[in-house]
């Protein structure tokens, strides 16, 4: 049986280099979708590039509370999320800490603004995921789900459920994935990083996350980090073969 998988490139619009790498990955047929940072430094140019390269209909939203400048004012008064006018990663390191009422309202307003900005630019969003997986946090998840539903987004990324995961985290992830589907969201059956399936059989209906970028030699890679100011990683893989067909989120 031919297996169908989704390859989603995160961080579109983050900067010029990674956005052009994602465009090249589309041209090579290596990815099926990308999710956009509405507060990315290269957003306008990235959207124009998506139109030019004919993948404007394959864009989702990459919800963000951890990097760059917020689009709204209220969240700037929430020090667990913003300091010095830019998002920090304070709350992301303490996801089990309850949110205050004002924080919940500010988060909802910010996520709504991010989606609205992309919609105003003409993007018909196919799905949602998030920067540093903030949409899976126990207290942020209901807010993200509610905002996405209000915008008619009914497809969302799972919590990672393939690869090496300890017993406690596996339970947490399984509960989230069940909850997400109970909220009415359409999902894949599995979600993995490239390293989770590099030497394994890829199950049918899996989403694989990649971060296309160019290394210092201009090679298209799946970015795993930075070194000396340049992205480092492995060559962006081609998962296509006789047993695997790529599909987009629109086909899910």
Q: Residue spans of the language-model regions?
A:
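DG-centered beta-turn motif at the end of beta-strands
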Residues: 9-13
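Terminal accessory/targeting
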Residues: 2-6, 16-112, 116-127, 135-252
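Active-site histidine-anchored catalytic micro-motif
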Residues: 132
